[in-house]
Amino acid sequence: MKKKVTIDEALKEILRLEGAATQEELCAKLLAQGFATTQSSVSRWLRKIQAVKVAGERGARYSLPSSTEKTTTRHLVLSIRHNASLIVIRTVPGSASWIAALLDQGLKDEILGTLAGDDTIFVTPIDEGRLPLLMVSIANLLQVFLD
């Protein structure tokens, strides 16, 4: 008996094999595989599987993070601290912009904005009351442990 493919598996396979520039393009590719879905649902699935939009030869495209990318982020983040309204992430020199881009893509519904220098990122949450939860989301996305 053939195993039924889930939409998560189909989406991961599309991203692995061909990628996509837009969520609408992903909707069309999923529809071609028999999954009728909406852009907002695709957006949620992309967050769930931690897909990010990366620049490449064919322009910016959605992609799955590799296991080495997750391992790399763990070694690039030196600390994550916060006050009542702002999260500050210290990184090794030269990596703040790359990590800020991961945060912007992976947590765009929780983050109002990021500002990255060479080794420091300021993260402003959409809702200050949810700042502790955002700290956990950031730690999970970057595969780091909080102090």
Swiss-Prot record:
Single biological process term from Gene Ontology: negative regulation of DNA-templated transcription
Pathway stated in the Swiss-Prot or TrEMBL entry: Amino-acid biosynthesis; L-arginine biosynthesis [regulation]
Coiled coil: none
GO molecular function: arginine binding; DNA binding; DNA-binding transcription factor activity
Cellular component terms (Gene Ontology): cytoplasm
Main localization, broad class: cytoplasm
Keyword tRNA processing on entry: no
Keyword Amino-acid biosynthesis included in the entry's annotation: yes
Compartments, as annotated in UniProt: Cytoplasm
Keywords: Amino-acid biosynthesis, Arginine biosynthesis, Cytoplasm, DNA-binding, Repressor, Transcription, Transcription regulation
A Pfam family that the UniProt record links to this protein: Arg_repressor
Family label: Belongs to the ArgR family.
Annotated function: Regulates arginine biosynthesis genes.
Name the record gives this protein: Arginine repressor
Protein species of origin: Chlamydia pneumoniae
